[in-house]
A protein has these predicted regions:
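A domain-level signal for the structural core that forms small-molecule/cofactor-binding pockets
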Residues: 2-69
Length: 69
């Protein structure tokens, strides 16, 4: 607890993803006042032609930041 799931277009290497995951872990741990070790991060690549379909999996209420924000 907590878990952050990031989805993005393909094209970034593993090192870039690792750096992003570490920064997210640090920020979330600080904001939620939890130990970094309990924060997990996954990163999933989604092809551009499947992006809209992918976003439809999520309930509107779960978007706290969106393109229209």
């Amino acid at each position: 607890m907590p878990h952050i799931a990031v989805t993005m277009y393909p094209g970034r290497d593993a090192e870039t993803k690792r750096k992003l995951a570490l920064k997210l872990q640090e920020t979330v741990a600080e904001e939620l006042k939890v130990r970094k070790e309990v924060v997990t991060v996954t990163i999933e690549d989604v092809d551009p032609e499947k992006w809209e379909e992918h976003l439809e999996r999520f309930e509107k209420e779960t978007f706290f930041v969106s393109r229209n924000a």
